A protein has these predicted regions:
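Extracellular fibronectin type III
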Residues: 9-26
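Short, small-residue-biased leader/transition segments that mark boundaries at the very start
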Residues: 223-228
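Beta-strand-rich modules
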Residues: 1-11
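Short, conserved, GDST-rich strand-edge loop motifs in beta-rich repeat architectures
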Residues: 69-85, 132-162, 229-237
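Beta-propeller blade termini
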Residues: 51-58, 115-123, 127, 205-217, ...
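Hydrophobic beta-strand segments that make up the repeating blades of beta-propeller
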Residues: 66-70, 130-134, 218-220, 231-235, ...
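Surface-exposed loop and turn segments in beta-propeller and other repeat-based domains
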Residues: 31-43, 103-109, 177-199, 258-270
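Acidic carboxylate motifs that coordinate Ca2+ or other divalent cations, activating on Asp/Glu
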Residues: 61, 65, 125, 285
Length: 439
């Protein structure tokens, strides 16, 4: 029988927590404290439901805590008008103890694209920090208000087109705002991002990347040193694209570099971003690059290459092909032309392509078949599951999802996670079988 073991080191004492692979539930049940709902200025009532989550060891005890985002029931996509309730963040220990609550306030709109939160130990003190974009009226985990508590920049359509934007780093243990600076990439002229109603300008991404090969950075993105860890914040991906890298030394956030597709020589990088990004050392120099959809930004904040294939909804970065050096990228495209592409992550060279006259909205990659070397890949219009040479190894697979992959059952193959269902590809029968359903 397989047995999974997690060990925490407290001082010089080693403690064990064991969950047998055949445990009756196969999961931990963590109670949550649901925020109270409210009413918008238009009279619409809203409630809260748990949304995205991340993990980090915020107290240094060797056990992860969960940072949970609560979204109101009236959260909106950027394309839609309407007021929303405030976004709320909680931190929980695995036993359900709530450590803090952060209320983002009325000047941060609720929706999938607005608030990207990074949880990581950025200064090497053994405890994770939390970094995200904030606004006037954000209340930290100690009850302190950031900026002007009375400011309200929402217009009659519930959109936020004016007002200051901030980047805040929070203490992961207490939720205290340790430093707040002006957010870069700034909003500026809305039309630079593609429209005047913040559908394009308020699409954000973020990641953690080892830009010097040793210490992580935070990178904040908009639009589709020293010995400390760094982060990158991004804005925009349909038109203008800006990425800003930051270092945190335990006292100060310092900007490392800014990449802007509006800068001379960078126009090929505009409009290439996805709704997601990937991080990895694609050129073998020991430092992380940022694969920003159909382009890649080098670790020094310069452009590495652009395929110019434009925005897409999904992609995967890994060492797909064991017979080929380096990393590769599997992508799908919206442009009703390029379909699905498999490319060299270092150069952008297209290794193989399945063209399509449709918007290919999802693609997936995972090692699900032991009969073929490397990682298998498929998309909504890939004509089946492909191996690393582009050959179809299964033309139709019933129940094959295009959402997420997990290691679930203890073998070396991946399982697939879609909503509350874990499924496993049966390569002998050519179908996916459910192995866990969470009610």
């Amino acid at each position: 029988d397989r047995l999974y073991t997690v060990k925490a080191i407290k001082g010089k004492t080693e403690s064990n927590y064991q969950l047998p692979a055949d445990a009756p539930t196969g999961y931990l049940n963590i109670p949550l404290v649901r925020p109270e709902g409210g009413t918008t200025p238009s009279g619409q009532a809203y409630t809260y439901a748990p949304n995205d989550a991340s993990i980090g060891d915020v107290d240094g005890d060797g056990e992860y805590e969960i940072i949970l985002k609560w979204d109101p029931s009236n959260a909106h996509d950027n394309a839609h008008d309407g007021y929303t309730g405030p976004v709320i963040f909680d931190c929980y220990k695995l036993n359900g103890q709530q450590l803090w609550r952060i209320n983002m306030g009325r000047n941060v709109r609720a929706g999938a694209h607005y608030t990207q939160f990074m949880v990581f130990d950025l200064d090497g003190d053994g405890r994770a920090e939390v970094v995200m974009k904030t606004g006037d009226g954000t209340v930290d985990g100690t009850g302190k208000v950031i900026g002007d508590a009375n400011a309200d920049y929402r217009n009659e359509r519930g959109r936020i087109l004016t007002g200051p934007e901030y980047l805040t780093i929070f203490n992961g243990l207490t939720g205290e705002a340790m430093q707040t600076i002006d957010y870069v990439p700034e909003r500026g002229n809305l039309m630079d991002w593609g429209d005047g109603r913040a559908n394009r300008s308020d699409r954000y991404l973020a990641c953690i990347a080892y830009l010097d090969g040793v210490h992580p950075s935070v990178v904040m993105c908009r639009g589709l040193g020293d010995v400390y860890k760094r982060q990158v914040m991004c804005r925009g991906y349909y038109t203008r694209t800006v990425l800003a890298a930051y270092d945190w030394d335990g006292k100060n956030l310092k900007n490392r570099w800014v990449f802007d597709s509006n800068n001379p020589g960078c126009r090929a990088y505009a409009g290439q971003g996805n709704h997601n990004l990937r991080v990895g050392d694609v050129d073998g120099d020991g430092c992380d690059e940022i694969v920003y959809g159909q382009c890649t930004i080098n670790n020094d904040g310069t452009g590495l290459y652009s395929t110019r294939m434009g925005h897409g909804d999904a992609m995967h970065l890994t060492h797909f092909d064991p017979s080929r050096p380096g990393l590769q990228v599997w992508s799908c495209h919206e442009n009703r032309r390029d379909g699905s592409t498999f490319r060299d992550a270092a150069t952008g060279e297209i290794i193989f392509q399945i063209k399509s006259n449709t918007d290919v909205g999802r693609c997936m990659a995972a090692d699900i078949d032991p009969n073929h070397p490397g990682v298998e890949m498929w998309s909504l219009d890939s004509k089946g599951v492909r191996n690393v040479k582009g050959e179809v190894i299964a033309s139709r697979v019933r129940g094959l999802s295009t959402n997420m992959a997990v290691w679930w059952d203890g073998d070396l193959l991946r399982e697939l996670l879609d909503r509350n269902v874990v499924s496993k590809y049966n390569w002998e029968k050519g179908l996916c079988e459910r192995i866990a359903v969470f009610e």
